[in-house]
Amino acid sequence: MQAAATWDPQQYLRHATHRTRPFHDLLARISELPGHPPRIADIGCGPGNVTVLLTHRWPDAHVTGYDSSPDMLEAAKSYEGATPGGGRLDFAHADAAHWTPDQTYDLIVSNAALQWVQGHADRFPAWYEHLAPGGTLAFQVPGNFTSPSHALLGELCDAPQWRDRLGDGHGRRFIHILEPAGYLERLSGLPGLADEPDVWKTTYVQLLQGEDPVLDWTKGTALRPVLTALADDSAARGEFLAQYRDLLRKAYPAGPRGTVFPFRRIFAVVRKKAVQ
């Protein structure tokens, strides 16, 4: 049985500016919410740095961030409490694979989390059902899993040296996304839509700084299952990281102004029809 990946909030936040930009782009496509004040759920909230942005857009909202990682929730506590606009921000433990709302929400949103949840598209009907009339379901997932950073990770996990320890999916088990057309098809089947689902993709051409920045990036996300699997063997962990680092250096050579790291992301926004 695979151990659940452990998370390091500080490592994840090392590239917070690049990781946060897609959420701003997602928020820009969300219409005003029906509730006064609105009730909002953030699925897979991580350390809370993105969740707090919801209170900037809707200052009087009651926002709850849900995550399955105790370490991430502990980091998120620094944002918890009453908000300047008269709303409230709190956090709770929940696994997105099983979370079913116990109340009505005006917005259910998820940023860069559902790729870890196998079959997450099957959860859409239950989440949508718990939207208020005029409410919105919106999410963003990485769509970068065929890029060198992720493909090389999977290939290395399946190499003879690592296959017995890592070849059962530790390097690839997070690839649970659909292509944009797949999300459009699933969301279009939801009842009572206000309009056609808004689904799109964007490739962010990022310039990362520092030594081996792509390796540093993946340590916060894609490498987490591998690092968890090798946590009790520091020598093996170091050897794996050295091999992966060398592959990444060839795939993403450093330039005079940094390392170019393109990253594709997939977005979707769907709105329920308001009561007439």
Regions found by a protein language model. Name each.
Residues 3-20:
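Class I SAM-dependent methyltransferase Rossmann-like catalytic core
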Residues 17-38, 53:
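Conserved alpha-helix/loop element of class I SAM-dependent methyltransferases that forms part
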Residues 39-99:
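Class I SAM-dependent methyltransferase SAM/SAH-binding core
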Residues 47-49, 173-189, 193-276:
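Conserved Class I S-adenosyl-L-methionine
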Residues 97-108:
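A short acidic, Gly/Pro-enriched loop at the edge of an enzyme's catalytic core
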Residues 107-120, 143:
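A short SAM/SAH-binding and catalytic strip from SAM-dependent methyltransferases
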Residues 117-118, 131-133:
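Helix-to-beta-strand junctions that scaffold the AdoMet/dcAdoMet cofactor pocket
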Residues 121, 128, 136-209, 233:
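Conserved catalytic/acceptor-binding region of the Class I
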